[in-house]
Swiss-Prot record:
InterPro entries linked: Dimethylallyltransferase, IPT, P-loop_NTPase
Protein name: tRNA dimethylallyltransferase
Role according to the record: Catalyzes the transfer of a dimethylallyl group onto the adenine at position 37 in tRNAs that read codons beginning with uridine, leading to the formation of N6-(dimethylallyl)adenosine (i(6)A).
Keyword Nucleotide-binding in annotation: yes
The protein's Enzyme Commission number: 2.5.1.75
GO process annotations (BP): tRNA modification
Organism in which the protein naturally occurs: Pseudothermotoga lettingae (strain ATCC BAA-301 / DSM 14385 / NBRC 107922 / TMO) (Thermotoga lettingae)
Signal sequence region: none
Subunit structure: Monomer.
Family named by the database record: Belongs to the IPP transferase family.
Entry keywords, A to Z: ATP-binding, Magnesium, Nucleotide-binding, Transferase, tRNA processing
Region (Interaction with substrate tRNA): 31-34
UniProt GO molecular function: ATP binding; tRNA dimethylallyltransferase activity
Amino acid sequence: MIIITGPTAVGKTDLSIAICCKLNAEIVSIDSRQLYRYMDIGTGKPTLSQRKIVRHHLIDIVDPDEYYSVYQFRLDAIRAIQDIVKRGKIPLFAGGTGLYIDSLVRGIFEGVSRDEELRKQLLQKETQCPGVLRSMLERIDPELADRIHKNDLKRTVRALEIWIKSKEKPSELRKKVKPVGRFTVIILHRDREELYDRINLRVNEMFQAGLLDEVKDLMKRGYSKNLNALRTIGYQESIAHLEGKLNFESTVELVKKNTRHFARRQVIWFRRYKDAIVIDLSSSSYRDAVNTISRIVLQDFQHDSFYDGGFSYD
């Protein structure tokens, strides 16, 4: 299967739709923000007209106040693959959320359910004795502790939760996970200045399209500004503006700045995929890129066994 990824504003959406039109394929979104309802403009969702041209999966599937894990994404992605293949079409993954991509190509462990009472107890211990949870993690699973930043309390609590409930080291459990299947990752690239210009243009277009009104609507619906869904670039800055903390010009510039920083982090993350195919959109034409990726998708379709029912959906 094929994953098309790249930093925000690089051109994933338009390119993926063009490829799907050529190949009678459908898109499975790999975006941790586009899955939320009522958050269209700020997340850069494909328009309704684009979604009529090509069917998209895993967009608008949960409300902003619903919990949605990487593991749930993996399960939903598998169901989407089954549905698309059953109807004789090709699934094309597109999006820029690195953890979601990892859950597909490397697998993810989510063997124990969330235990809110246990988490509350752990956080109380941390409040009473700052650093105690980090010390616990270093003692029970030093391998995992080396991979979790000392100030990352959220992941530390999750690791301890897994250990307490499973009686096994999280690092050992993670070694047992398997990828969903065989994936070819295609990374779209643009020269930095060109990418930043596209980001600045996109942010301007978002505000012109009514981002502030979209944020007002979310507030009217009763959604807290502290929700994970609303801790999204574009929304947090807009909320600050609506609260009188930023003027409009400063808000727009801050969204541009934060989006550029986010794109830089995405580029660094994608370097992890050593076997990925890089398509440079700054040096090749849009048409050539569509044709090149379409050929890759077709070759994958012809040689991957899962299209013939040989795919494992564990």
